[in-house]
């Protein structure tokens, strides 16, 4: 009986549908602000849809959302990309430059923008899945520093 249960548990673990579908590899662990690059590899036999977000480390071990999507400007619309089976893509992007607003009505936006543009420790958060409505698998990259 124990052998049967053990075999069933191993089989379920082997056929786990929520296993990691992609692998993220950084070109470095330290980047200047104008040349952040990384590669994403599809480790599955099916097309994988994915969206990349950037998180910044705050005080302690907590990470907060820095951008909704690294492929468009900060706080912009999300872009979902497709990666073919056993394929990979290399991406390079630049963070938004610091913006200074001197008009009173833009004071709140300026304060928020300047706060977000501080250098620090970051990581990529990648949502992926086999279709657009079920991108529920989350994969994190190694942490890296932006100088």
Where are these regions (language model features)?
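Sec-dependent N-terminal signal peptides
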Residues: 4-15
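Short Trp-Ser/Thr-centered turn/loop motifs at beta-strand boundaries
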Residues: 133-147
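Short Pro-Gly-centered flexible turn/kink motifs
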Residues: 83-95, 139
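Low-complexity, acidic Ser/Thr/Pro/Gly-rich terminal tails and inter-domain linkers that flank the onset
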Residues: 17-30
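Internal, hydrophobic beta-strand segments that form the core of beta-sheet-rich folds
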Residues: 103-132
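The feature marks short-to-medium sequence segments in extracytoplasmic or secretory-pathway proteins
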Residues: 45-88
